[in-house]
């Protein structure tokens, strides 16, 4: 038989995986948000984001928003597998995503007690969409931004970046149009992961592997040019 490691992707690095694959979807979201803010002539360092979710995509979107764009993350949300409900976690000085990574389990459940001790305010899971923010990043569940939840959105919101698959319903799309909110659709916004899977196949075929910076630079170019 022939050795063809590129037939499936998302492999560990030792088995022919690609650097940057873990971060790719979340960082891809941020590359598209950066371009949207440029288009709208908004200073990313003065912007605030509210994020739904704290799985892989939301984690790296939060990190990217703070570390790459210089913005502030007002909140993230997560499903608490112990309480069987979702919560929103916010902090008056902005969420520290690197800290939250130290208190989240492998399933995306944030340690509620540790968060409270660190000064985080814990609210109902739907509270994320009500926050005073310039950018909303739904990165959790399909259809959560809909005719009902858009009524709770702050008038400050200028960008909705679809980190999840299908997080916004057609009714939400109509709301965005009516209120001049710039919507980055999921098939572009969250394409960083599948694009980097393609990069993984390319590297497998060449049997030559790029550094993380090389992968992420190529991803940025592919998504924004």
Give, region by region, the residue ranges found by the protein language model:
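Generic secondary-structure signature for well-ordered alpha-helical cores
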Residues: 1-5, 34-42, 66-71, 81, ...
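Glycine-rich phosphate/diphosphate-binding loop of Rossmann-like nucleotide-binding domains
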Residues: 20-23, 27-130
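Structural motif
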Residues: 5, 48, 71-75, 134-135, ...
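Short glycine/serine/threonine-rich phosphate/pyrophosphate-binding segments
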Residues: 57-61, 144-148, 168-170, 191-193
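N-terminal ligand-binding/catalytic initiation module
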Residues: 1-17, 32
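Rossmann-fold NAD(P) dinucleotide-binding segment
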Residues: 122-133, 143-160
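Adenosine-phosphate binding glycine-rich loop
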Residues: 139, 154-225
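A short glycine/serine-rich beta->alpha loop
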Residues: 13-21, 182-185
